[in-house]
């Protein structure tokens, strides 16, 4: 019990997670599960990369202390050390917090997770309703910088909202049980030789081996963005990477979504023919690649041959880890295949454009809420006509133009009297007051512009709608 039941209806607000109390300024060990969400939020708001380490103070340390104090040899006692701390999977925690937070907290969580180089939710599952939601609004706050090859010589860079960036999406999914750790392999694939980072939670991380209860069906996304250094860049072009948690046989909607939005889908498998029937029924807009472990007991070369024939796959679409291949070689081979898939594909998509695919498949989009749409409509009414910024300000904000500039100059002169010369001071000030009065009359002669009318209407709307408007 994470103590979040009260927030299923009344969501966690931004003001709540920004509250300061004694626990905020101290770093005490976790003693119960109800402390975990707030501990995670505190660490995440500080952009602490250890935020996902949410292990409780367990009995394991006590048992080890007791064992170290005794002089007797008792190997069975060492084997039976309980592991009570690793009972909550970080993915369950993240899923629970996103489900229990309002849109503005979700946006802040996604931004801070991205800053920590964590993957962020793309499709959020809800085990109560058995539906998933495209987290478009939550990702809108993420802005990324990168340097494509075209700008490497000039040392320039591109900066844009990640939801608007049209990038090739490469998805990784699992069919049936698999001895290969898909997420750990992905982390190695995205890390260069000089620096390893756990972008995705995996089995060998702290608490990563705890059973998932509510996060199966979660599709996470991260982005690989080049820095322009050929010696460090893994991919020369920016690419989005999606990772679906759980067996695609149980989450066909999420799998269909990824098949229709991705440039390539890599399917990790080891099971027999029965599981592959799902692949035959998909409407593919992406290349399919099969990734398997030859050393697995359930691997069958004959089954793979039949499936590859049915899907019209060639050797380039199949990556196998054999007994002569270690993890480093396997990751290198997989990385080369991903790189080729990115280079040979022109199928690019933005997260914004994924919304239309989501609607076709019955996937919810959190931006479809009435308050968000109203706030977005009001914001678009103000920004839609902006082409030439200076001309726009002159037409729509005339009180901030030349008249305002002249007024400020007159007010400064009224107090400083730098240009009074030999004139009578009182007469000079009176003249300045007359000039100010004339300028005020000019200001008052302007009718309220349409943009200001829209702004006043939007800022006077209901609280949630106004917040969406200001955040747009």
Question: Where do the language-model regions lie?
Answer:
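Conserved GTPase G-domain substructure that encodes guanine base recognition and part of the catalytic core
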Residues: 1-472
């Amino acid at each position: 019990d994470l103590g979040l039941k009260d927030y299923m209806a009344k969501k966690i607000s931004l003001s709540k997670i920004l509250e300061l109390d004694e626990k905020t300024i101290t770093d005490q060990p976790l003693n119960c599960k109800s402390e975990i969400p707030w501990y995670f939020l505190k660490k995440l708001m500080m952009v602490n990369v250890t935020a996902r380490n949410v292990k409780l103070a367990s009995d394991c340390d006590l048992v080890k202390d007791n064992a170290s104090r005794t002089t007797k040899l008792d190997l069975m006692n060492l084997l039976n050390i309980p592991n009570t701390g690793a009972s909550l999977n970080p993915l369950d925690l993240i899923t629970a917090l996103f489900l229990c937070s309002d849109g503005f907290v979700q946006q802040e969580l996604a931004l801070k997770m991205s800053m920590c180089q964590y993957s962020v939710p793309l499709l959020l599952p809800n085990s109560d309703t058995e539906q998933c939601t495209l987290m478009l609004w939550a990702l809108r706050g993420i802005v990324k910088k990168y340097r494509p090859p075209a700008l490497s010589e000039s040392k320039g860079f591109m900066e844009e909202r990640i939801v608007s960036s049209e990038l090739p999406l490469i998805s990784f999914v699992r069919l049936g049980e698999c001895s290969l750790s898909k997420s750990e392999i992905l982390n190695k694939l995205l890390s260069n030789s000089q620096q390893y980072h756990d972008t995705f939670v995996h089995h060998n991380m702290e608490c990563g081996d705890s059973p998932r209860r509510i996060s199966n069906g979660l599709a996470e996304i991260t982005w690989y963005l080049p820095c322009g250094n050929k010696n460090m860049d893994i991919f020369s072009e920016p690419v989005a990477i999606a990772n679906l948690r759980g067996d695609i046989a149980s989450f066909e909607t999420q799998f269909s979504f990824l098949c229709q939005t991705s440039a390539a889908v890599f399917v990790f498998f080891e099971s027999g023919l029965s599981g592959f029937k799902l692949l035959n029924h998909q409407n593919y807009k992406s290349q399919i690649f099969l990734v398997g472990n030859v050393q697995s007991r359930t691997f069958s070369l004959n089954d793979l041959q039949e499936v590859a024939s049915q899907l019209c796959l060639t050797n380039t679409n199949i990556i196998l880890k054999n007994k002569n291949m270690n993890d480093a070689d396997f990751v290198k081979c997989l990385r080369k295949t991903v790189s080729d898939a990115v280079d040979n594909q022109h199928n690019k998509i933005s997260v914004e454009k994924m919304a239309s695919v989501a609607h076709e498949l019955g996937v919810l989009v959190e931006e479809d809420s009435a308050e968000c749409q109203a706030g977005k409509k009001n914001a678009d009414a103000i920004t839609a006509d902006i082409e030439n910024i200076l001309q726009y300000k002159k037409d729509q904000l005339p009180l901030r133009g030349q008249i305002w500039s002249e007024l400020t100059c007159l007010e400064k002169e009224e107090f400083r009297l730098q240009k009074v010369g030999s004139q009578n001071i009182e007469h000079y000030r009176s003249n300045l007051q007359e000039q100010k009065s004339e300028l005020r009359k000019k200001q008052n002669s302007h009718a309220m512009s349409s943009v200001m009318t829209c702004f006043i209407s939007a800022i006077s709307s209901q609280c949630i709608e106004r917040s969406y408007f200001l955040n747009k």
